[in-house]
Amino acid sequence: MKNLWLVLIMLSMFAFARADDYISVNNYIQNPYNNQISAGGRNFVTESDIQNKGLWEQFFTNGTYNAVGLASWAVLNVPNNNYAYGANLFMQSGHVGGFALGGMLEVVNPFLQPGYRYLSGDISYALLPNQQVVTPSELYLEYQLPNQVQVDGGWIFLETPWMNSYDDAMLVSGTFQGVLVNYQMTDNWRLTAIGTNAYQEMGSNSFNQDTMYNSSYGNFVTRSPSTGLQQVIPNGYGSDGSLAFGAIYKPSADYNLNLWGYSFSEYANTLYADSNYQVHLNSSNKFNFGVQVGNQNTWGMANTVPELVGYGGVNSYLGGAKIAYSYDEWFKAELSYDGMYGQQSSFYGGGFISPYTFTIVNDPLYTSGLGAGLIEQGAGNSWRAATTFHPIPGDSHTKIELAYEQFNTVSPMQEWDLDIKWVPEGAPRGLIVHWEADYAIAPSSDLVNGGDFFFMQTILSYNY
């Protein structure tokens, strides 16, 4: 952690560059609902708001809030089903002298708790808590020098490739205790530094050293690669925290490059990069090309958790590519491929380990499906074919995504996905109906997910 503080000091000393709008009083990067439709619209702070208001008025009126009501029902291999409901309130004050306060309160299942009475065995689904959850998932102090530096410290929300707090199928988020620093080095380059020492997994009321591999959060699909048990890594084998450093290069809206390095304490180091480039044939037709590479290792680490529990150390390489075609924001088709390889005696036959995206499947891999990806299925290769479209051209009220994934991995699987988002015409602004379904087939001898598997979830949300 000492190294992180040195980086923070250095970033603050060299904050003298112009920037894009990422570090801005109008971009609330701690808000999980920052880019979603809201009935209350957006509060845009102007230069006049900053110059002509008193300090208290700036604090109370130059900020933002989102109140989100949520209800969801999921079916996990009929007749196993579960529901959850609740509301989340995010609030951030306006900046005064560069400083702002923010936080989010999550309230799930306040009156009736579904528990496990609708579920067989120990099948659990972390995105839909089975118990009552009332917790401040975020509480932070922010300092911002617009277009140059932003520091967020406390219980914070992260949105990076391998530490991602939110997915639109979640009723609750997975937040971190730590510090996030963004520094706009030039107009095109932004640097990011992260240091954390605790994690609050979905459905928890407190921050701790657990990861998504601990047995309390065992997934309904993925089981131990060596024993077939749902207890992937026993409780008590957690992580003391993480360090991450990123460099984001974005010279235009059509090209970006992301470079990341992570150190997940007691687990592994991760080096990762991806790049995307769009080619416009004309105003309606365009292609998108992407590549991603990565490496995991245990340099400088002794007695990592995977080794201690008998799964072998982490040692793996990743490579992937995608090509997509889109027409006039109405239709998109995409084909992607990922390969992940390492020593067969290493963790999951040479696979990656991902402490904070495992089983949530919100990692950056191109071929990840709704139910699983290479992180869940182990070393090998996978490919994905998908299409996204609006059923009625020119009408954006309904969006449908169809996808097929093939995993030629330690734990092989085929998966079909259907994802529908619907904004009812004439309904209150901010109301969204989200329905997704996943059907997977795996060999009966597959220790991860033997036989057929079906998952369906309906999410109703209202954002104000």
PLM regions: where:
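Hydrophobic, lipid-facing positions within transmembrane beta-strands of outer-membrane proteins
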Residues: 85-89, 135-139, 177-179, 241-245, ...
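Transmembrane beta-strand segments that form the barrel wall of outer-membrane beta-barrel proteins
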Residues: 68-75, 151-166, 191-193, 245, ...
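Surface-exposed coil loops of outer-membrane beta-barrel proteins
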Residues: 33, 115-133, 137-138, 148-252, ...
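N-terminal signal peptide c-region/cleavage motif recognized by signal peptidases
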Residues: 12-16
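Outer-membrane beta-barrel translocator/channel fold
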Residues: 108-114, 189-242, 284-359, 433-463
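C-terminal structural cap/anchor segments
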Residues: 332-423
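Solvent-exposed loop/turn segments connecting transmembrane beta-strands
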Residues: 76-82, 145, 158, 166-173, ...
